[in-house]
Amino acid sequence: MTQYNVTGMSCAACSARVEKAVSRVPGVTSCSVSLLTNSMGVEGSAAPQDIIAAVQAAGYGASLKGAGKAAPSAAEAEAALEDHETPKLKRRLLWSLGFLLVLMYFSMGHMMWGWPLPAFYTDNHVAMGLTQLLLTVAVMVINQKFFISGFQSLWRRAPNMDTLVALGATAAFGYSTYALFAMTGAQVRGDTEAVMTYMMDFYFESAAMILTLITVGKMLEARSKGRTTDALKGLMKLAPQTATVERDGRELEVPIKQVQRDDIFVVRPGESIPVDGVVLDGASAVNEAALTGESLPVDKAAGDTVSAATVNQSGFLRCRATRVGEDTTLSQIIQMVSDAAATKAPIAKIADRVSGVFVPTVIAIAAVTTAVWLLLGQSVGFALARGISVLVISCPCALGLATPVAIMVGSGLGAKNGILFKTAASLEETGRVDIVALDKTGTITAGEPQVTELLPADGVSEAELLRAALALEQKSEHPLARAILARAQADGLTADEVTDFRALSGSGLTAVRNGQTLQGGSLAYVSTAAEVSPAMRARCEALAEDGKTPLLFSENGRLLGVIAVADVIKPDSPQAVRELRNMGIEVVMLTGDNERTARAIGAAAGVDRVIAGVLPDGKDAEIRRLRERGKVAMVGDGINDAPALTRADVGIAIGAGADVALDAADVVLMKSRLSDVPAAIRLSRATLRNIHQNLFWAFFYNTLGIPLAAGVFVPLGLTLNPMFGAAAMSLSSFCVVSNALRLNLFKLRDPKHDQKRRKKPASANTAPAEEKTTTEKEKKPMKKTMKIEGMMCAHCEATVKKALEAIPEVVDAEVSHTAGTAVVTLQSPVDDAALKKAVEDKDYKVLGIE
């Protein structure tokens, strides 16, 4: 996705106009415009100059972010988010208020409260009117932006919020000016009664008040919008500006842009680590809270990786740079949060559709309102006041901001806690999952076997047993051997030398130590050389039932004991599973392990269902079957789980560390904590609730406000002065943004208020997984080949694949962006229109289906 800065947008109608204009450019496959960040993301083969020209033709400005680079630097991105509007609006507001207060004194102070006026104005109604006109002109000149933008947009037949304000203020000013000239004529004729009548028709103060109040609203909105990007700007400020590198045997402090890959850099206590790297020398505790949300420092020593913007707290570190510039973990996180803000959530389509026709509809309603009241015999002033009220109370901004402000705050809050949502759609969909499928290794468990128990035989000490095991296992490459070596190292043991070492495939190990034959391995293997008591055999069976691997060791036919090794469950896994289940989510564990081990791990973790003995391609098939029963999130380490992560409705990569750009995942969790999964779902649900509240307020406000402004409730004695309409319009956007900012107070790790989602009833024809598999094999599959335009990368393939496989009749979809095709395997006939719609809803073009 190529990103652009867009200038000149003032409301949702503007962003809709830009999006529509760019989408028409040949070669553009998708376009998403963010009013909140004044940015635009474009995918496709169209040249940047063509896209910029299209934006300019629509009446707005555009520039390529980062001077053509795919990802702008942190400094450039921070500058783009800098709040330049609030200071300008503040100056405009102060000048406007100064003239408005004087205008209100002349127009209402003397008449309503008897405030004194200069003698010159006594009975000089024309002078009074001219003074009000000049003061109003001053306010209009100060706020000329509304008129320039509004009438230019109207001329281009793409009216926006500024158009409504400009029309309302112009109508009030124009009618008041007419009344002033008419009053002047009446005064020349000596018609005192007509003079007073026309003077009551002055709406100069309404025109000035409308402009001033809208400016108040714009300033509050700009200030609040600035706060929604605080999390993102906070991340950008973490980026160090300099680094201390070794050059020609000397330490030099250089700008961060000059650090290159494989440079050697040093970090002293209290300094921020400048780039991603690997520790060569030294040891320290590093605070990674800025990137992962982890409050406790992490110990680092030679061979460990470090990330940019984390803080070295205690020791001296000498490191080699591995990722610099835009490739660092921090830069990727910033880019991911920016991309999420630049994309649109599916729920935003409702507001987009309304925003596209909102302003023209409001203008039409205002015109009809004015005409109807005139036909009903009301005065021009009364009818015009109703029409102006309709114009100034209507607020497309509240609709346009309802979704993006909540997405920005939600994604920023997630980033601060080590939870990264790649797109707005992933932030929305995560909270809607019904089933969470968990990979076992590295997700539920630590992913590294550990010694859990030492069971020495009678007359043998634990140290003796472990020393014999160490002597055998030191030459083995087996993962279980590494667990024994780690335990021996922790206990301070050193390995004895052995000879005649042999590894017997599938059985165990044998070697000679000090003339004594050592054997180690499975019960079946060791029992051929040493006598194993029934009690020890029973203990081995019990260990196996618990999902542990019992390793037996003997010396010259004498049993030394048993060492139990297992991939242990992470401390937070059972609690995380409980939280998911309390949310009403079914938890399934997928693993390639044997049934017995898998059942033991599943029982310890507390999952609802265990599916064992599945390879990566088997996980893909299982996810497809699970999706028949609801929305599925697949949680894995992103290494061998890529097919399943892609197949699921939401792919969550856990423990990604520095690899935050995993293509297959929709959500990336920086830490290896399963507890971040319910936290991500909790945050998604809170964000979705916030969006619903914002949309409800925006629709409710306009649904109630427009009829009130039009005078529908006049028979009940309720009318709305245009000034109050402008005040309401100003507050509506402010309320929406303020509500979104409440998300910053949300405690995403607190399960206290978790609610269960209502699950969709299973369809009557949904068979159990085993029956479904049989049915699919019995049917002869049908295939269709789709020609698709607009796919550019593996991510495009994944998007199209997921869209097609969401159709119940589709068994599989093989997508190639290089060939521009999707080969769809069907279990039953499906209409071509359904296939086409699924792809084109994702903004790709279907050229044909065979």
Predicted regions located by residue number:
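Conserved catalytic phosphorylation-site environment of P-type ATPases
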Residues: 291, 350, 385, 398-472, ...
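Conserved cytosolic catalytic loops of P-type ATPases
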Residues: 25-43, 48-49, 202, 233-327, ...
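Conserved ATP-binding TGD loop and adjacent catalytic N/P-domain core of P-type ATPases
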Residues: 16, 29, 269, 433, ...
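Transmembrane helix-loop-helix hairpins at the membrane interface
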Residues: 88-242, 353, 722, 748
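P-type ATPase nucleotide-binding
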Residues: 451, 455-585, 595, 607-623
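Juxtamembrane coupling segments of multi-pass membrane pumps/enzymes
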Residues: 2, 183-186, 192-193, 208-269, ...
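Flexible metal-binding regulatory segments at protein termini and peripheral loops
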Residues: 1-127, 225, 250-251, 331, ...
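Membrane-embedded alpha-helical bundles of multi-pass transporters
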Residues: 112-126, 155, 174, 413, ...
